[in-house]
Design a protein with these regions (language model features):
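Non-catalytic helical tethers at domain boundaries
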Residues: 1-128
Length: 128
């Protein structure tokens, strides 16, 4: 009986977390649609960072490690912008990352290693 209840709670958590991640990614999509370039994106960073931060925390807890890793990289870069850094090309990178995370929510076999490596290489100076 306890096992069944635990499973139900776990299933319910996963269902709710999945719904929340979809919502957070959709919020990001809407914000990104209102941007045209790095400067526009920089002006919306505080809003979008909240969504990535939530995704970064929720995704690994529900078995979406890849999404969590990508959200973490993006969250770190956005925090640098919020600290006053100018990051060339960040708008396109974030847009690509958000799309890939949405794709991952539909198909867990989507490959992210290429984008992760590109981010780590292109923006190496911003990572500790």
């Amino acid at each position: 009986m306890k096992y069944s209840r635990r499973t139900n709670l776990s299933d319910e958590f996963t269902k709710q977390a999945t719904k929340e991640i979809h919502e957070e990614l959709e919020h990001n999509s809407q914000i990104l649609k209102s941007c045209q370039n790095d400067e526009d994106f920089s002006n919306k960073c505080s809003e979008i960072e909240k969504h990535f931060h939530k995704i970064k925390g929720l995704a690994p807890m529900m078995g979406q490690k890849k999404i969590g890793e990508l959200a973490s990289l993006n969250d770190e870069l956005i925090k640098k912008i919020l600290e006053g850094e100018k990051i060339k090309g960040i708008f396109e990178t974030i847009k690509q990352s958000n799309k890939l995370m949405k794709d991952l929510m539909q198909d867990s076999t989507v490959e992210i290693d290429g984008l992760k490596q590109t981010i780590k290489t292109k923006y190496a100076e911003f990572f500790d």
